[in-house]
Amino acid sequence: MIKAIIGKIIGTRNDRWIKQYKKKVLAINALEPTYEKMSDDELQNAFEELKKRVRSVEKDLQEKTLLEVLPESFAITREASKRILKMRHFDVQLIGGMVLNDGKIAEMKTGEGKTLVATLAVALNALKGESVYVVTVNDYLAHRDSKEMEPLYHFLGYSVGTITASVRDDDERLEIYSKDIVYGTNNEFGFDYLRDNMKYSLEHKVQKSHAFAIVDEVDSILIDEARTPLIISGPVDRRMENYNKADEVAKSMQVEIDFTIDEKNRTILITEEGIKKAENLFGVDNLYKIENAALSHHLDQALKANYLFFIDKDYIVANNEVVIVDEFTGRLSEGRRFSEGLHQALEAKEGVSIKEESQTLADITFQNYFRMFSKLAGMTGTAQTEATEFLEIYNLEVVSIPTNLAIKRKDLNDLIYKSEKEKFDAVILKIKELHDKGQPVLVGTASIEKSETLHALLKKERIPHTVLNAKQHTKEAEIIKDAGLKGAVTIATNMAGRGVDIKLTDEIKELGGLYIIGTERHESRRIDNQLRGRSGRQGDPGTSQFYLSLEDNLLRIFGSDRIKGVMEKLGLKDGEHIESKLVTRAVENAQKKVENLHFESRKHLLEYDDVANEQRKSVYKFRDELLDVNYDISAKIAENREYALNQIFSKLKAFDHQNLSEEELLGLKNILKEDFNAHVGLEDLKKASPIENFIAEKLKSDYENKMKVLDSEQRSRIERIVYLQILDNAWREHLYTMDNLKTGINLRGYNQKDPLVEYKKESYNLFLELIEDIKMEAIKTFSKIQFEDEQDSSDAERYLDNFSEEREHESVTYRHEEALDEDLNVAMKAFAKTPKRNEPCPCGSGKKYKDCCAKSGPKKGLFAK
């Protein structure tokens, strides 16, 4: 209350920002007459001068210079837009551009021209000479926006590229990323970053810098998708029959007897009776013994699949596959899979083919990917409800931009009914009334199931209509565009189709504009605001109203008893509703509860991922050093050799190495032979003084003798590639260990320990072990490198060529969240460590190692026995 009064007197922080930006708008507008008089060539030359000015200063002074040239850059960009696109930036759009350049989020209502606004900040920041990324939510918008704005950018002397899922060729991707301005989806940018850190050449990395990114629909990408990391993964060996058996057991269990459901937290707790039943059906005496850990895990996931996840709401079944439905957009999430075996549990539930579980090979959250950028900005129509999260997680402030024309849309109070049937009956009556009048109506639903219920009711009443949900996602843009036609009735799930304007004719405006009906409040107020925002664009008339029932999930799970109490006191008859600001406010309070739960969940995820992120950055930095041809890899190998020997001697009983017993010397001899391929006689060890110097020289001379056949470039390439393989394999194993650690860490809470603190401690220790393992594995592998002909380097060159060729033709699938793809083990088998007897032979024969090269020696020269 006090805050509101102070805001009215001195203005809010947002008001003060807008006031400052308006002063700069005056400066930009003052330049317009000057640039209007220029020819195209003169205008382009003026912009080229700005490029020279910005690029001539030191890098750390470029941001300051950008602010100095901002008025000229914005004025030239606007003039160019007038000539090329036939569109002039409004003053409020200039403000939006300045907000983006300041690294903030511009909240602009639907229809205010966010795509055009972005050109101002993009053109300005591209002056520095580093690629600017424009991030969108789907391939359609990335392609549309880049093609629409490309003529403007070309006029200003910029090149433009678009990254979509259809761009498969690595060289083509490399070419696109070399452009001044790159449009693409958040998934493509994120996966390209992960792919870059699996490349074996710096020249093949596509993302050269992370200077500036503008994220369109920033709330969808940085908030809604923050809980689902990008993961590249490979298959894990699991027994597929366990999924089906667990599904049978789960289906036989009864709610409230064998298990209880916590709908608020979406968890299931098995009772003692349930445990006994499961043990009986699985045929085990104790479900929670260590050897039965896989069974108990499968059962947990099967229970979730059967009782917390629902077809046509959380997923659909299409083409013998379970496909996730995005809870926020209603779109199908093609290629995305639930993690930790949940997706396999859903496949067992629905009786479709079960795909293998997968192991993480590389991963990152959107939070940590986008926080890498030196400057980050965003645009959306709905951000203020999440302003705290944007500031706390991303250090992004939200600035609400005034509309160019006043909003005329009427937002009516919610209507609340006792039952869902009564609610839908009322919705159908309202739709019929509007349709008969010719006024277009857009109906928002919370799930595919509800949209199809409404579809059936409208069909029964013979009211023509169009349905847009995940099953019709390919026609999304076309359906949304036509939603403003006379008499149009459009049903849309969770307001998919963002980014597509619904334009109205004068006749429709006379009828009252687009009428929005929400059939259920979403868990997030922001999603509801997005639905409302489809109406009333650019000063158009319109109306919005939500129809609710006490049976809706939000009110049933989170709604206060006050709403139910009011309904009971009023003694409403069938079909009657209540409409009051008090009830609407109570509904919004319920939404705030859920929003806070989701915020805490995302923050919790980030706290854990921040631990892994520091390790990821460290590993990727070292990886880049190895890729650098100027890095002294030979010195690193020598350092590892010294470390390995220190480790060996530290484990021997007598630290006085000259007084080792014969038994210890024999053990040392065997270690040198097995681990380092060094053949040393027992008598030589007895005579050596000091022994550590003798061994160090022996290992070094053996290695140098093998490497003599290579020229310096060949040697450097081989050493770097082998070391990279060792690093990559160790990192993947580390990620697997970290996944397992994270899965069980919450159990520490029962022991009065903070799981996050425990996770930090243990992950740090695991990281130290990772570093040690890499050093030891590196020196062991390098010690075993051999050539068939020690006088000929062609063997090494052949393997380098094969390596490059096989890497180039790897077929790998990258997916959002949990992805299944071909195993990423690099085909340069010659450099692999000695396999175990039952592992596949690295020569590629397809036989087990014990039946192949273990008997006859390696078929390929670089692999040592």
Curated annotation (Swiss-Prot):
Subcellular localization: Cell inner membrane; Cytoplasm
Keywords: ATP-binding, Cell inner membrane, Cell membrane, Cytoplasm, Membrane, Metal-binding, Nucleotide-binding, Protein transport, Translocase, Translocation, Transport, Zinc
Database matches in InterPro entries: Helicase_ATP-bd, Helicase_C-like, P-loop_NTPase, SEC_C_motif, SecA, SecA_CS, SecA_DEAD, SecA_motor_DEAD
TM stretches of this protein: none
Keyword Protein transport appears in the UniProt entry: yes
Coiled coil: none
Broad EC category: translocase
Catalytic activity: ATP + H2O + cellular proteinSide 1 = ADP + phosphate + cellular proteinSide 2
GO CC list: cell envelope Sec protein transport complex; cytosol; plasma membrane
Entry-linked HAMAP family: SecA
Family from the record: Belongs to the SecA family.
NCBIfam families: PRK09200.1, secA
Protein name, per record: Protein translocase subunit SecA
UniProt organism field: Helicobacter pylori (strain Shi470)
Organism lineage string: Bacteria, Pseudomonadati, Campylobacterota, Epsilonproteobacteria, Campylobacterales
Gene name for this UniProt entry: secA
